[in-house]
Amino acid sequence: MIVPVRCFSCGKVVGDKWEAYLNMLQEEELDEGTALSRLGLKRYCCRRMILTHVDLIEKFLRYNPLEKRD
């Protein structure tokens, strides 16, 4: 779904780091741990928020509940 704005455990803002994280993985070809460290995510609870997020918003945008199926 949508990236959580804050860490569920400690409350640190993590939502603004998602785009930069994806950019580091794709363009700079860093591994996950290095990218998270460069973003300043030191606590394991905050790292978990980014590592375990599954971005499903694009799939849900294609779904139209009012569309009739034949």
Swiss-Prot record:
GO terms for biological process: transcription by RNA polymerase I; transcription by RNA polymerase II; tRNA transcription by RNA polymerase III. NCBIfam families: PRK04016.1. Signal peptide: none annotated. Keywords: DNA-directed RNA polymerase, Metal-binding, Nucleus, Transcription, Zinc. Component of the RNA polymerase I (Pol I), RNA polymerase II (Pol II) and RNA polymerase III (Pol III) complexes consisting of 14, 12 and 17 subunits, respectively. Zn(2+) binds at residues 7, 10, 45-46. Belongs to the archaeal Rpo10/eukaryotic RPB10 RNA polymerase subunit family. It is found in: Nucleus. One of its GO terms (molecular function) is DNA binding. It comes from the Eukaryota. This is DNA-directed RNA polymerases I, II, and III subunit RPABC5. DNA-dependent RNA polymerase catalyzes the transcription of DNA into RNA using the four ribonucleoside triphosphates as substrates. Common component of RNA polymerases I, II and III which synthesize ribosomal RNA precursors, mRNA precursors and many functional non-coding RNAs, and a small RNAs, such as 5S rRNA and tRNAs, respectively. Pol II is the central component of the basal RNA polymerase II transcription machinery. Pols are composed of mobile elements that move relative to each other. In Pol II, RBP10 is part of the core element with the central large cleft. The gene is RPB10. Its main location: nucleus. GO terms for cellular component: RNA polymerase I complex; RNA polymerase II, core complex; RNA polymerase III complex. It comes from Eremothecium gossypii (strain ATCC 10895 / CBS 109.51 / FGSC 9923 / NRRL Y-1056) (Yeast). SUPFAM superfamilies: RNA polymerase subunit RPB10. HAMAP family: RNApol_arch_Rpo10 (MF_00250).
